[in-house]
Amino acid sequence: MILDIAREVSVVMRQAGVNGAVIGGVAVVLHGHIRTTVDVDVFVPDPPERLADALRAGGFAFDAGKKEFSKSGVPVHLVLVDQVRRPPIERIELEGVTTVSLADLVDMKLRTGSSDPLRAQDLADVIGLIRHHQLRRDFARNLGADVRGEFKKLVDAIERG
C-alpha cells in the first residue's frame, strides 16, 4: 500500500514537472534495507505549491491541522529544501518510484541521525544500508565532507562486529 502511494506521488511529480524525490523510510526500503514505515516523505526542491496543487488534483486530501497530505490512509509529508541540511543531488527510479541515490540517502540519514538524538532510526537505517550493500570506507567519498568521518566510524564498528 505505501509503495503504491509512493508510486502515485512519483507520477504526480512527473506530470507536474516537479523535480522532487521520495526520501525517508520508503527510500530506505527501495534501496534494499527492509524495515517498516507508515508514511511517504517527499523532498520538494521547488516551491511546494505546484506539487501541493497537483496532489490535490490527484485525489490526495490535505489535513491543515497535521500539515500533511494523505491517500488511502497513508500520510504524505512534503519536506522542503530549508528542512534538509544538504539537498539531495541525484534522482533515480526504483520500482516505479522517483527517489534519491544511495549516496544522497546515506548522506541525508547521517545528517539527521547524527545531529538529533531522537532520530536514532536514521542511524539504524544507515547501518542497515551499509550491511545490505556491503559498503566500505571508500564509499565515504560520495558523501559530504562533514559526514564522511561518521560514516567511516559506522563501517569500522560493523566490520569489528
Question: Which residues are covered by each model-predicted region?
Answer:
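Compositionally biased terminal segments of proteins
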Residues: M1-G161
